[in-house]
Amino acid sequence: MNPETYLPIKTDRLILRKFQAADLASYADYHTRDDVYRFLYAAPPSDDAVKTQFAALLEAPFEEDGDTLRLAVTRSDDDTLIGEVLLKIASKAALQAEVGYVFNPDFSGKGYATEAVRAMISLGFETLGYHRIFARLDALNHGSIGVVERLGLRKEAHLIENDRFGGTWGDEFIYATLKREWASSP
């Protein structure tokens, strides 16, 4: 399905839309921060790498397993880019997607991530027809854990030392919800 048919998505305070070339500076601002990447098992990218990464997301397909739909999250009152949400096709055959999100820490603590992720999960179930949507989170990322728990996702797994960055092993939690569970949640 062409994203143009269901975008932008408007919530009470936010707009989820395709990234635009004019978003590069704000995108780079949070994508080069250590405090953003500490739970992503990677070092912040260089300025050149951010530009390459940004150019790729502008034209990224969303049709096959592994493809990712990344949406800019802006405040509706001033169009400030505050982060992004994503849906990654985990299995087209099994109708499963992974939800993810990255936000500028300057805007944390205001419920924006919860509001945006709620809209993205709803898009996944109601418009795109997924059966199951899951999130993979670093076990130490308490803010992110709070987001998925507030949304009613169920903790399904605790993966022990399943990823490594900078010589340090990290644990991950898997949270998920099914379409029927999401439909019956408040």
Question: Predicted regions span which residues?
Answer:
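Short loop/turn motifs at secondary-structure junctions and domain boundaries
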Residues: P61-G66, L153
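Acyl-donor (CoA/ACP) binding surface of acyl/acetyltransferases
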Residues: M1-R38, V73-P186
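Short helix-to-loop capping/linker segments positioned immediately adjacent to catalytic or ligand/cofactor-binding
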Residues: E59-F62, G109
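Conserved GNAT-fold acetyl-CoA-binding loop/helix
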Residues: D35-L58, D67-L71
